[in-house]
Protein backbone atom coordinates (compact mmCIF):
# COMPACT_ATOMS: atom_id res chain seq x y z
CA UNK A 1 0.00 0.00 0.00
CA UNK A 2 1.37 3.42 -1.00
CA UNK A 3 1.11 5.86 1.87
CA UNK A 4 1.50 9.61 1.66
CA UNK A 5 4.26 9.91 4.22
CA UNK A 6 7.02 12.48 3.90
CA UNK A 7 10.60 12.05 5.08
CA UNK A 8 12.44 14.18 7.64
CA UNK A 9 16.06 13.87 8.65
CA UNK A 10 17.38 14.93 12.06
CA UNK A 11 18.08 18.47 10.89
CA UNK A 12 14.62 18.83 9.42
CA UNK A 13 12.94 17.71 12.63
CA UNK A 14 15.10 20.03 14.70
CA UNK A 15 14.03 22.98 12.53
CA UNK A 16 10.39 21.91 12.77
CA UNK A 17 10.53 21.68 16.55
CA UNK A 18 12.16 25.09 16.86
CA UNK A 19 9.60 26.77 14.63
CA UNK A 20 6.35 24.94 15.38
CA UNK A 21 6.87 22.65 18.38
CA UNK A 22 3.33 23.15 19.70
CA UNK A 23 1.89 22.04 16.35
CA UNK A 24 4.07 18.97 15.98
CA UNK A 25 3.03 15.56 17.35
CA UNK A 26 5.89 13.08 17.75
CA UNK A 27 4.86 9.42 17.87
CA UNK A 28 7.64 7.10 19.07
CA UNK A 29 6.95 3.54 17.90
CA UNK A 30 9.68 1.85 19.95
CA UNK A 31 9.12 -0.40 22.94
CA UNK A 32 8.23 0.94 26.36
CA UNK A 33 11.67 -0.09 27.62
CA UNK A 34 13.53 1.76 24.84
CA UNK A 35 11.31 4.84 25.15
CA UNK A 36 11.96 5.17 28.88
CA UNK A 37 15.69 4.71 28.38
CA UNK A 38 15.67 7.80 26.17
CA UNK A 39 13.30 9.73 23.93
CA UNK A 40 12.76 13.04 22.16
CA UNK A 41 11.32 15.57 24.59
CA UNK A 42 7.56 15.83 24.14
CA UNK A 43 7.18 12.61 22.17
CA UNK A 44 4.42 10.07 22.85
CA UNK A 45 5.08 6.34 23.01
CA UNK A 46 2.85 4.23 20.74
CA UNK A 47 2.13 0.74 22.10
CA UNK A 48 -0.58 -1.87 21.80
CA UNK A 49 -0.87 -5.50 22.77
CA UNK A 50 -0.18 -8.49 20.55
CA UNK A 51 -3.83 -9.49 20.73
CA UNK A 52 -5.02 -6.05 19.59
CA UNK A 53 -2.45 -6.16 16.79
CA UNK A 54 -3.62 -9.60 15.68
CA UNK A 55 -7.30 -8.69 15.75
CA UNK A 56 -6.65 -5.51 13.75
CA UNK A 57 -5.50 -7.62 10.76
CA UNK A 58 -3.34 -4.86 9.37
CA UNK A 59 -5.80 -1.97 9.86
CA UNK A 60 -5.24 -0.47 13.30
CA UNK A 61 -7.70 2.20 14.44
CA UNK A 62 -6.40 5.63 15.42
CA UNK A 63 -7.73 5.13 18.97
CA UNK A 64 -5.00 2.51 19.46
CA UNK A 65 -2.27 4.70 17.99
CA UNK A 66 -3.23 7.82 19.96
CA UNK A 67 -5.28 6.55 22.94
CA UNK A 68 -5.23 9.94 24.69
CA UNK A 69 -8.64 11.43 23.91
CA UNK A 70 -7.47 15.04 24.03
CA UNK A 71 -4.51 14.48 21.72
CA UNK A 72 -6.58 12.43 19.31
CA UNK A 73 -9.29 15.10 19.25
CA UNK A 74 -6.75 17.79 18.42
CA UNK A 75 -5.26 15.60 15.72
CA UNK A 76 -8.62 14.94 14.06
CA UNK A 77 -9.51 18.63 14.32
CA UNK A 78 -6.40 19.54 12.33
CA UNK A 79 -4.66 21.30 15.22
CA UNK A 80 -1.31 19.72 14.36
CA UNK A 81 0.76 20.95 11.42
CA UNK A 82 2.72 17.69 11.33
CA UNK A 83 2.84 14.21 12.84
CA UNK A 84 6.28 12.61 12.92
CA UNK A 85 6.71 8.84 13.28
CA UNK A 86 9.97 7.30 14.43
CA UNK A 87 11.48 4.01 15.51
CA UNK A 88 14.96 3.11 16.70
CA UNK A 89 17.04 3.46 13.52
CA UNK A 90 15.14 2.64 10.31
CA UNK A 91 16.42 4.44 7.23
CA UNK A 92 13.15 4.13 5.31
CA UNK A 93 9.51 3.38 6.03
CA UNK A 94 9.50 0.80 3.23
CA UNK A 95 11.68 -1.43 5.37
CA UNK A 96 9.23 -1.51 8.29
CA UNK A 97 7.36 -4.74 9.03
CA UNK A 98 3.84 -4.62 7.59
CA UNK A 99 2.35 -5.67 10.93
CA UNK A 100 4.82 -3.66 13.01
CA UNK A 101 3.91 -0.66 15.15
CA UNK A 102 5.49 1.83 12.74
CA UNK A 103 3.63 0.61 9.64
CA UNK A 104 0.32 0.23 11.48
CA UNK A 105 0.61 3.74 12.90
CA UNK A 106 1.40 5.19 9.47
CA UNK A 107 -1.59 3.41 7.96
CA UNK A 108 -3.99 4.65 10.64
CA UNK A 109 -2.79 8.24 10.31
CA UNK A 110 -3.07 8.25 6.53
CA UNK A 111 -6.61 6.87 6.72
CA UNK A 112 -8.00 8.92 9.59
CA UNK A 113 -5.92 12.10 9.90
CA UNK A 114 -5.85 13.25 6.30
CA UNK A 115 -5.75 16.95 7.19
CA UNK A 116 -2.34 16.58 8.83
CA UNK A 117 0.99 15.99 7.09
CA UNK A 118 2.60 12.73 8.24
CA UNK A 119 6.38 12.37 8.26
CA UNK A 120 8.83 9.56 8.93
CA UNK A 121 12.04 10.39 10.81
CA UNK A 122 14.93 8.97 8.80
CA UNK A 123 17.44 7.19 11.02
CA UNK A 124 15.00 7.17 13.94
CA UNK A 125 15.78 8.07 17.52
CA UNK A 126 19.35 6.83 17.22
CA UNK A 127 20.27 9.36 14.52
CA UNK A 128 18.31 12.22 16.08
CA UNK A 129 19.75 11.74 19.59
CA UNK A 130 23.27 11.71 18.14
CA UNK A 131 22.63 14.91 16.19
CA UNK A 132 20.43 16.77 18.69
CA UNK A 133 21.12 15.43 22.20
CA UNK A 134 19.85 18.66 23.75
CA UNK A 135 16.34 17.82 22.50
CA UNK A 136 16.35 14.34 24.03
CA UNK A 137 15.66 13.08 27.52
CA UNK A 138 17.70 10.15 28.79
CA UNK A 139 17.16 8.33 32.04
CA UNK A 140 20.09 8.35 34.39
CA UNK A 141 21.80 5.12 35.36
CA UNK A 142 19.23 3.02 37.26
CA UNK A 143 20.86 3.06 40.65
CA UNK A 144 19.56 3.98 44.05
CA UNK A 145 20.33 7.19 45.84
CA UNK A 146 23.80 7.06 47.29
CA UNK A 147 23.61 8.34 50.84
CA UNK A 148 25.56 7.25 53.91
CA UNK A 149 23.82 4.48 55.79
CA UNK A 150 23.78 4.18 59.53
CA UNK A 151 25.47 1.09 60.89
CA UNK A 152 22.41 0.10 62.89
CA UNK A 153 19.65 -1.84 61.17
CA UNK A 154 15.99 -1.46 62.24
CA UNK A 155 14.66 -4.43 64.17
CA UNK A 156 11.96 -4.92 61.54
CA UNK A 157 14.51 -5.58 58.82
CA UNK A 158 15.80 -9.04 59.57
CA UNK A 159 18.99 -9.57 57.65
CA UNK A 160 20.08 -13.08 58.40
CA UNK A 161 23.57 -11.59 58.57
CA UNK A 162 25.80 -10.36 61.33
CA UNK A 163 24.33 -7.61 63.50
CA UNK A 164 26.83 -5.07 62.20
CA UNK A 165 26.01 -5.47 58.51
CA UNK A 166 23.29 -3.92 56.37
CA UNK A 167 21.10 -6.38 54.43
CA UNK A 168 21.25 -6.14 50.66
CA UNK A 169 17.70 -4.88 50.31
CA UNK A 170 18.44 -1.89 52.59
CA UNK A 171 21.68 -0.88 50.90
CA UNK A 172 21.87 2.21 48.73
CA UNK A 173 18.58 4.04 48.53
CA UNK A 174 15.22 4.03 46.78
CA UNK A 175 15.46 3.39 43.04
CA UNK A 176 13.71 5.43 40.37
CA UNK A 177 11.25 3.38 38.34
CA UNK A 178 9.74 6.40 36.60
CA UNK A 179 10.38 10.09 37.22
CA UNK A 180 7.53 10.14 39.76
CA UNK A 181 7.71 6.55 41.07
CA UNK A 182 10.31 5.05 43.40
CA UNK A 183 10.75 1.61 44.98
CA UNK A 184 12.56 0.49 48.10
CA UNK A 185 12.41 -0.98 51.58
CA UNK A 186 10.94 -0.10 54.97
CA UNK A 187 14.37 1.11 56.02
CA UNK A 188 14.41 3.61 53.18
CA UNK A 189 10.92 4.71 54.25
CA UNK A 190 12.35 5.55 57.68
CA UNK A 191 15.03 7.82 56.22
CA UNK A 192 13.51 11.28 55.82
CA UNK A 193 16.78 12.57 54.38
CA UNK A 194 16.55 10.08 51.52
CA UNK A 195 12.90 10.84 50.85
CA UNK A 196 13.42 14.59 50.86
CA UNK A 197 16.48 14.34 48.62
CA UNK A 198 14.34 12.57 46.01
CA UNK A 199 11.44 14.98 46.32
CA UNK A 200 9.07 12.30 47.60
CA UNK A 201 5.64 13.67 48.56
CA UNK A 202 3.69 10.46 49.18
CA UNK A 203 4.32 6.86 50.21
CA UNK A 204 2.50 3.58 49.59
CA UNK A 205 3.11 1.21 52.50
CA UNK A 206 2.43 -2.31 51.20
CA UNK A 207 2.50 -4.12 54.53
CA UNK A 208 0.40 -4.79 57.59
CA UNK A 209 3.06 -3.97 60.16
CA UNK A 210 5.54 -1.38 58.83
CA UNK A 211 4.96 1.99 60.53
CA UNK A 212 4.29 5.26 58.72
CA UNK A 213 7.10 7.30 60.24
CA UNK A 214 6.32 10.80 58.97
CA UNK A 215 2.56 11.15 58.65
CA UNK A 216 2.79 14.88 59.30
CA UNK A 217 5.14 15.38 56.36
CA UNK A 218 3.97 13.00 53.59
CA UNK A 219 0.72 11.62 52.25
CA UNK A 220 0.39 7.90 52.97
CA UNK A 221 -1.55 5.07 51.37
CA UNK A 222 -1.64 1.78 53.28
CA UNK A 223 -2.11 -1.58 51.57
CA UNK A 224 -2.18 -4.09 54.45
CA UNK A 225 -1.27 -7.37 52.76
CA UNK A 226 1.05 -10.14 53.92
CA UNK A 227 3.73 -11.66 51.73
CA UNK A 228 2.32 -15.17 51.41
CA UNK A 229 0.54 -17.33 48.86
CA UNK A 230 -2.89 -16.66 50.40
CA UNK A 231 -2.76 -12.86 50.13
CA UNK A 232 -4.95 -11.16 47.53
CA UNK A 233 -2.83 -8.22 46.41
CA UNK A 234 -4.59 -7.84 43.06
CA UNK A 235 -7.69 -6.39 44.73
CA UNK A 236 -5.53 -3.36 45.56
CA UNK A 237 -4.04 -2.82 42.10
CA UNK A 238 -6.50 -0.26 40.75
CA UNK A 239 -6.65 1.67 44.02
CA UNK A 240 -2.86 1.87 44.18
CA UNK A 241 -2.59 2.87 40.51
CA UNK A 242 -5.17 5.63 40.95
CA UNK A 243 -3.29 6.91 44.01
CA UNK A 244 0.01 7.03 42.12
CA UNK A 245 -1.65 8.85 39.23
CA UNK A 246 -3.24 11.39 41.57
CA UNK A 247 0.15 12.21 43.09
CA UNK A 248 1.77 12.39 39.65
CA UNK A 249 -0.97 14.70 38.36
CA UNK A 250 -0.38 16.98 41.35
CA UNK A 251 3.31 17.18 40.48
CA UNK A 252 4.43 14.90 43.32
CA UNK A 253 6.48 11.72 43.63
CA UNK A 254 5.52 8.41 45.19
CA UNK A 255 7.75 5.98 47.09
CA UNK A 256 6.38 2.42 47.22
CA UNK A 257 7.78 0.11 49.89
CA UNK A 258 7.08 -3.03 51.86
CA UNK A 259 9.50 -4.66 54.32
CA UNK A 260 12.36 -5.38 51.95
CA UNK A 261 11.20 -3.86 48.66
CA UNK A 262 11.35 -7.24 46.97
CA UNK A 263 7.89 -8.79 46.64
CA UNK A 264 4.81 -6.78 47.66
CA UNK A 265 5.95 -3.29 46.69
CA UNK A 266 7.56 -4.60 43.50
CA UNK A 267 4.23 -6.21 42.60
CA UNK A 268 2.44 -2.86 42.93
CA UNK A 269 5.03 -1.16 40.72
CA UNK A 270 4.72 -3.91 38.11
CA UNK A 271 0.93 -3.58 38.07
CA UNK A 272 1.27 0.18 37.62
CA UNK A 273 3.57 -0.17 34.63
CA UNK A 274 1.38 -2.84 33.06
CA UNK A 275 -1.85 -0.85 33.23
CA UNK A 276 -0.65 2.66 32.54
CA UNK A 277 1.80 1.70 29.79
CA UNK A 278 -0.05 -1.33 28.42
CA UNK A 279 2.96 -3.63 28.58
CA UNK A 280 3.20 -7.33 29.29
CA UNK A 281 4.40 -8.65 32.62
CA UNK A 282 7.72 -9.91 31.28
CA UNK A 283 8.56 -6.49 29.84
CA UNK A 284 7.56 -4.66 33.03
CA UNK A 285 9.47 -7.19 35.13
CA UNK A 286 12.68 -6.72 33.15
CA UNK A 287 12.28 -2.93 33.31
CA UNK A 288 11.96 -2.91 37.12
CA UNK A 289 14.60 -5.60 37.65
CA UNK A 290 17.18 -3.52 35.78
CA UNK A 291 16.59 -0.82 38.38
CA UNK A 292 16.28 -3.01 41.49
CA UNK A 293 17.88 -6.34 40.71
CA UNK A 294 16.64 -8.12 43.84
CA UNK A 295 12.90 -7.91 43.12
CA UNK A 296 11.19 -11.28 43.44
CA UNK A 297 7.38 -11.30 43.83
CA UNK A 298 6.10 -14.49 45.39
CA UNK A 299 4.55 -17.25 43.30
CA UNK A 300 0.97 -16.20 44.03
CA UNK A 301 1.64 -12.55 43.25
CA UNK A 302 3.14 -13.52 39.88
CA UNK A 303 -0.02 -15.47 39.11
CA UNK A 304 -2.17 -12.49 40.04
CA UNK A 305 -0.03 -10.24 37.83
CA UNK A 306 -0.47 -12.63 34.91
CA UNK A 307 -4.22 -12.53 35.42
CA UNK A 308 -4.01 -8.72 35.56
CA UNK A 309 -2.04 -8.76 32.31
CA UNK A 310 -4.87 -10.53 30.51
CA UNK A 311 -7.31 -7.90 31.79
CA UNK A 312 -5.09 -4.94 30.95
CA UNK A 313 -3.95 -5.94 27.49
CA UNK A 314 -7.20 -7.40 26.20
CA UNK A 315 -10.19 -6.27 28.29
CA UNK A 316 -12.60 -7.52 25.63
CA UNK A 317 -10.67 -10.60 24.57
CA UNK A 318 -10.62 -12.69 27.74
CA UNK A 319 -11.18 -15.88 25.79
CA UNK A 320 -7.97 -15.30 23.84
CA UNK A 321 -5.97 -14.07 26.79
CA UNK A 322 -6.73 -16.49 29.58
CA UNK A 323 -4.26 -16.16 32.41
CA UNK A 324 -1.45 -18.75 32.29
CA UNK A 325 -1.43 -18.51 36.06
CA UNK A 326 -4.63 -20.54 36.15
CA UNK A 327 -2.77 -23.44 34.54
CA UNK A 328 -1.03 -24.13 37.83
CA UNK A 329 -4.35 -24.45 39.61
CA UNK A 330 -5.93 -26.68 36.96
CA UNK A 331 -4.86 -30.23 37.64
CA UNK A 332 -5.98 -31.37 34.23
CA UNK A 333 -3.86 -29.00 32.20
CA UNK A 334 -0.92 -30.00 30.04
CA UNK A 335 0.69 -26.56 30.02
CA UNK A 336 4.45 -26.74 30.48
CA UNK A 337 5.34 -23.12 31.23
CA UNK A 338 3.84 -20.52 33.54
CA UNK A 339 6.51 -17.84 33.83
CA UNK A 340 10.26 -17.52 33.97
CA UNK A 341 10.77 -15.24 36.96
CA UNK A 342 12.28 -16.03 40.36
CA UNK A 343 9.80 -15.87 43.22
CA UNK A 344 10.39 -15.19 46.87
CA UNK A 345 8.05 -17.50 48.78
CA UNK A 346 8.45 -21.28 48.62
CA UNK A 347 5.27 -22.91 47.32
CA UNK A 348 4.20 -26.50 47.86
CA UNK A 349 1.49 -27.21 45.26
CA UNK A 350 0.04 -30.66 44.80
CA UNK A 351 -0.05 -32.95 41.78
CA UNK A 352 3.50 -32.14 40.69
CA UNK A 353 2.64 -28.55 39.83
CA UNK A 354 6.26 -27.64 40.44
CA UNK A 355 7.01 -29.22 37.09
CA UNK A 356 5.41 -26.22 35.45
CA UNK A 357 8.18 -23.91 36.64
CA UNK A 358 11.29 -23.35 34.55
CA UNK A 359 13.08 -21.19 37.10
CA UNK A 360 14.09 -22.18 40.62
CA UNK A 361 12.04 -20.83 43.50
CA UNK A 362 14.25 -18.86 45.83
CA UNK A 363 13.62 -17.87 49.40
CA UNK A 364 14.13 -14.50 51.00
CA UNK A 365 13.08 -12.60 54.10
CA UNK A 366 9.50 -11.41 54.32
CA UNK A 367 9.34 -8.59 51.82
Curated annotation (Swiss-Prot):
The keyword Cell cycle appears for this protein: yes
Localisation: Nucleus
Catalytic activity, EC: 3.1.3.16, 3.1.3.48
One Pfam family this sequence matches: DSPc
Domain Rhodanese intervals: 20-137
Signals that turn on the gene: Exhibits night/day variations with a 100-fold increased expression at night in the pineal gland (at protein level). Up-regulation is due to a large degree to the release of norepinephrine from nerve terminals in the pineal gland and cAMP signaling pathway.
Superkingdom assignment: Eukaryota
Main location class: nucleus
Keywords from the named record: Cell cycle, Hydrolase, Nucleus, Phosphoprotein, Protein phosphatase, Ubl conjugation
GO cellular component: cytoplasm; nucleus
GO molecular function: growth factor binding; MAP kinase tyrosine/serine/threonine phosphatase activity; mitogen-activated protein kinase binding; phosphoprotein phosphatase activity; protein serine/threonine phosphatase activity; protein tyrosine phosphatase activity; protein tyrosine/serine/threonine phosphatase activity
GO BP, sorted A to Z: cellular response to chemokine; cellular response to hormone stimulus; endoderm formation; intracellular signal transduction; negative regulation of apoptotic process; negative regulation of cell adhesion; negative regulation of cell population proliferation; negative regulation of DNA biosynthetic process
InterPro entries, alphabetized: Atypical_DUSP_subfamB, Dual-sp_phosphatase_cat-dom, MKP, Prot-tyrosine_phosphatase-like, Rhodanese-like_dom, Rhodanese-like_dom_sf, Tyr_Pase_AS, Tyr_Pase_cat
Residues with the Phosphoserine modification: 359, 364
Similarity field: Belongs to the protein-tyrosine phosphatase family. Non-receptor class dual specificity subfamily.
PANTHER family, alphabetized: DUAL SPECIFICITY PROTEIN PHOSPHATASE, DUAL SPECIFICITY PROTEIN PHOSPHATASE 1
Protein name: Dual specificity protein phosphatase 1
Species per Swiss-Prot/TrEMBL record: Rattus norvegicus (Rat)
Gene: Dusp1
Amino acid sequence: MVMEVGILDAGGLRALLRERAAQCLLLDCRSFFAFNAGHIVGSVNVRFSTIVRRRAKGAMGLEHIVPNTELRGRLLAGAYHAVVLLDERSAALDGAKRDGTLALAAGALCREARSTQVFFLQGGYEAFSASCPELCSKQSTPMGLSLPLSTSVPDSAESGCSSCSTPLYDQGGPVEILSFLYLGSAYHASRKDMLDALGITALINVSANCPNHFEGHYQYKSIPVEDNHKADISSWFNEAIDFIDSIKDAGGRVFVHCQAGISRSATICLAYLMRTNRVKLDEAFEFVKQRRSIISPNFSFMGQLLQFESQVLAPHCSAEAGSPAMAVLDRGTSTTTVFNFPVSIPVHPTNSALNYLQSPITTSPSC
